[in-house]
């Protein structure tokens, strides 16, 4: 079974600050026996992230609008592919991650299978509140949607373990 993982890339002012979080969550998913659609969120800088994107997508177009469009289309293609679940780390604001989340929870409206979604948010990491576009999604309205706050990376990996166990 494949899992999509998303987290802030462009919006993260210093990717190295959150790299260990993304790496730990990705390792937990893989350790539970799931394959990853792609792992670029763990890149610590632009070049490493671009290299990881290249591994996931194949050769990237040169920097510029063609690459931007290519990457956007591939991300949406992955969200709309044959995945079993999607996990998002949403502690850092990201328009791209928000679009990925929207495509994931709107899959049924696109004629695609509904999948379980997990949003992880580190309490107090970002000075502003989480967008109501994410926090406003409720389990009552979207039963497959799981929003969980955590205080430590150990707590986040524990939440993720529980989520993955429910998939089996």
Residue ranges of model-derived segments:
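Conserved catalytic or regulatory cores that recognize and/or transform ribose-phosphate-containing ligands
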Residues: 1-168
């Amino acid at each position: 079974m494949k899992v999509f993982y998303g987290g802030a890339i462009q919006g993260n002012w210093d990717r190295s600050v959150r790299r260990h979080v993304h790496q730990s969550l990705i390792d937990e998913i893989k350790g539970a026996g799931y394959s990853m659609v792609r792992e670029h969120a763990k890149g610590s800088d632009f070049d490493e992230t671009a290299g990881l994107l290249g591994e996931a997508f194949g050769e990237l177009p040169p920097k510029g609008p063609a690459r931007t469009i290519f990457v956007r289309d591939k991300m949406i293609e992955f969200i709309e592919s044959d995945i079993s679940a999607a996990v998002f780390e949403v502690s850092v604001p990201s328009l791209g991650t928000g679009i990925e989340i929207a495509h994931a929870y709107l899959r049924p409206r696109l004629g695609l299978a509904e999948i379980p979604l997990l949003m992880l948010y580190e309490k107090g990491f970002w000075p502003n509140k989480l967008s109501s576009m994410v926090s406003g999604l409720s389990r009552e309205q979207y039963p497959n949607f799981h929003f969980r706050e955590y205080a430590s990376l150990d707590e986040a990996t524990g939440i993720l373990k529980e989520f993955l166990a429910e998939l089996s």
